[in-house]
From Swiss-Prot:
EC number: 2.7.11.1
PROSITE patterns named in the record: PROTEIN_KINASE_DOM (PS50011)
Top EC class of this enzyme: transferase
Subunit structure: Part of a complex containing ROPGEF1 and ARAC11/ROP1. The interaction between PRK2, ROPGEF1 and ARAC11/ROP1 is phosphorylation-independent. Interacts with ROPGEF12 (via C-terminus). Interacts with ROPGEF1 (via PRONE domain).
Molecular function terms, GO-annotated: ATP binding; protein serine kinase activity; protein serine/threonine kinase activity
Sequence positions bearing Phosphothreonine: T438
Keyword annotations from UniProtKB, A to Z: ATP-binding, Cell membrane, Kinase, Leucine-rich repeat, Membrane, Nucleotide-binding, Phosphoprotein, Receptor, Repeat, Signal, Transferase, Transmembrane, Transmembrane helix
Identification of the protein by name: Pollen receptor-like kinase 2
UniProt xrefs under Gene3D superfamilies: Phosphorylase Kinase, domain 1, Ribonuclease Inhibitor, Transferase(Phosphotransferase) domain 1
One Pfam family it belongs to: LRRNT_2
Family recorded in the similarity comment: Belongs to the protein kinase superfamily. Ser/Thr protein kinase family.
TM annotation in the entry: 248-268
Length: 647
């Protein structure tokens, strides 16, 4: 009986898979019929002989279509939303660099869509105000380099999960609205927007708002004129004017009196407070790290003077920084708290702050909130282990501060920013990306740093555990510096499983285990990201599997030869380096093997990269043509005169 039930379940499962496959096939073919395909044979694979998951530009997960990536195909015609509604798992659409125009399609009918990319098309009409109503899952919207007109849609302003918004290079008019949720990436440059920039955007890069002649206010240098035009106010009689004047004077006197009373009370309370308890804090200004991070140095309850004094002495002991490096000048936590601070970003574990000390040193303070799994003794012992690490491709931890509720890590400030910013952020600002020799040097350095961690932290299954492009900083000479390594023993298990890269690996997703090769998988994904220039999130239907999705996409697209659709054209290639780029892609895919037994170990991966480097040094004079010795020569600067144009 049990075997019959199992057989029935299997038959039903197969039946539904077949029905779904046919349904998605017919749905996509119907969608294809609405397109005008400019590039010959661009969608030739879209036929009934092959399953949809093998079609060009179709992204699948577990046999279901979750994304369409139809870029650079000279497509026009209409985007058949009704057909796309038949794809129940659809989460991502990309039609970048095509020739679509006309009315804005009704994407709001695709309520589960997470990302939409329409950059570099020919849309030239107004977007309806309700164009994004009901799209509560929308995270990323790229509409740059079109000719959209009219105001920014009000429905877009209400999007609860929007983290990326690019509207640059259009003809949007009107004022910038107040967004309900502040996007992490926003570019409104080169439009016809006017009015004052909302205060919530006042600390952003001015370049994100340039090219709008009517905009004023921070972060631009253009000051806004008074919002009131008194000359246009209607004239009133002398009697009414005098009456209004008397009311204004009376109100001003009353307000002044109330202010004086409040100030007096505040001064009284401050003096009373100073007499009753010791003041440990350095009284930082409003832009200090203490004010920005909300760090408190002491608990100021209503106990007696003696109990507060004992607490104060205890806090003096516990607020000392523990230094891991002797080559840095010593400073106290109070020096950090009273220093001017600038928030650099907020990652999955907490915020990072850039601080300028009185001695001129620039440090970064990273605040961790998910480190309650280790007691103070265990925590300090592990920090000493990390402090003993010394490698040119690791960012050292200078000092740390321990408190049960949160921890602070102090490190040197690296002005050149992260690899993620150079790969993805610079594009949004129209700046050149990293060239090929620089990218290869970064990959090689990351591999060496990772190998060092595996040699010196042998007790950890994943010595890094959180390798991704935003955790790779670049020095002035574009040497990679790994950060956020060795954190797994200190991060709460639940938070680690939710947030850390190691727990997104195939072996953990499928078997709930982390292995010695898990970091190698992270290295492989990083190599693919560097070579393709693709954002991992662009491939994510289920966020925790985004890296595996990128590897699957590359594996299905890579045919052993150079293709413009697969490789990032921003890095360029010289006449003799194509084979080396392809070999590095093969190394990356070998690191991304889903089967752990078939995956390279870290030593094998690094050896293959070193062998590739030797080949370059022996036979590729072209390799160094864009690889100057000066720091500015190895920056994001495109091709040399010998480069091949990939456009």
């Amino acid at each position: 009986m049990e075997s019959k039930c199992l057989m029935f379940v299997s038959i039903v499962s197969v039946f539904f898979m077949v029905v779904n496959g046919v349904s998605e096939t017919e749905t996509l073919l119907k969608f294809k019929n609405s397109l005008v395909i400019g590039r010959a044979n661009a969608l030739e694979s879209w036929n009934r002989r092959n399953p949809p998951c093998k079609w060009t530009g179709v992204l699948c997960d577990r046999g279901f279509v979750w994304g369409l990536r139809l870029e650079n195909l000279e497509l026009s015609g209409s985007i058949d939303i009704e057909a796309l509604m038949g794809l129940n798992s659809l989460r991502s659409l990309s039609f970048i660099n095509n020739k679509f125009k006309g009315p804005f399609p009704e994407f709001k009918k695709l309520v589960a869509l997470k990302s939409l990319y329409l950059s570099n098309n020919q849309f030239d009409l107004e977007i309806p105000k309700d164009a994004f109503d009901g799209m509560g899952w929308l995270k990323k919207l790229h509409l740059e380099q079109n000719n959209f007109i009219g105001e920014i849609p009000t429905s877009l302003v209400k999007s609860p999960k929007l983290i990326e918004l690019r509207l640059d290079g259009n003809r949007f008019t009107g004022q910038i609205p107040e967004f309900r949720h502040h996007p992490n990436m926003l570019n409104l440059s080169n439009n016809a927007l006017a009015g004052q920039i909302p205060n919530s955007f006042s600390t952003m890069d001015p370049k994100l708002f340039e090219g709008n002649k009517g905009l004023c206010g921070k972060p631009l240098d253009t000051k806004c004129s008074s919002p009131y035009n008194h000359s246009s106010e209607p004239k009133s009689s002398t009697k009414k004017t005098s009456s209004k004047f008397l009311y204004i004077v009376a109100a001003a006197v009353a307000a002044l009196a109330a202010s004086l009373i409040i100030i007096g009370v505040v001064i009284f309370l401050i003096r009373r407070r100073k007499k009753k308890q010791p003041l440990l804090s350095a009284e930082p200004g409003p832009s200090s790290l203490q004010m920005r991070a909300g760090i408190q140095e002491s608990e100021r309850g209503q106990g007696s003077y003696h109990s507060q004094n004992r607490a104060a002495k205890k806090m003096i002991h516990t607020t000392k920084l523990s230094f891991l490096r002797d080559d840095k000048g010593k400073f106290e936590l109070q020096d950090l708290l009273k220093a001017s601070a600038e928030i650099l970003g907020s990652g999955c574990f907490g915020a990072s702050y850039k601080t300028l000390l009185s001695n001129g040193s620039v440090m970064v303070v990273k605040r961790f909130k998910h480190m309650n799994s280790a007691g103070i003794d265990e925590f300090q012992e592990h920090m000493k282990r990390l402090g003993r690490l010394n490698h040119e491709n690791l960012l050292p931890i200078v000092a740390y501060y321990y408190k049960k509720e949160e921890k602070l890590f102090v490190s040197d400030f690296v002005a050149n920013g992260s690899l993620a910013a150079h790969l993805h952020g610079h594009k949004s600002l129209g700046q050149p990306s990293l060239d090929w020799p620089t990218r290869f040097n970064i990959v090689k350095g990351v591999g060496r740093g990772l190998l060092y961690l595996h040699k010196n932290l042998p007790s950890l299954m994943a010595p890094h555990g959180h390798l991704k492009s935003s955790n790779v900083l670049l020095s002035e000479k574009f040497e990679p510096l790994l950060m956020d390594y060795g954190l797994i023993p200190m991060i709460n298990e639940e938070s680690a499983q939710e947030l850390m890269v190691a727990y997104k690996s195939p072996e953990y997703v499928k078997q709930s285990r982390v292995t010695k090769k898990t970091d190698v998988w992270g290295l492989g994904v990083l190599i693919l990201e560097i070579l393709t220039g693709k954002l991992l999130e662009s491939f994510s239907q289920v966020d925790k599997e985004s890296e595996e999705d990128l590897a699957s996409w590359v594996r299905s697209s890579f045919k052993g030869e150079w293709t413009q659709e697969l490789f990032d054209q921003e890095m360029g290639k010289t006449s003799n380096c194509e084979a080396h780029i392809l070999n590095l892609m093969r190394i990356g895919l070998s690191c991304c093997e889903v089967d752990v037994e078939k995956r390279l170990d870290i030593r094998e991966a690094v050896e293959k990269m070193e062998d590739l480097m030797k080949e370059r040094e022996q036979g590729d004079d072209d390799f160094y043509s864009t690889y100057a010795s000066e720091a500015d020569g190895r920056s994001s600067r495109g091709l040399s005169s010998e480069g091949i144009n990939l456009s």
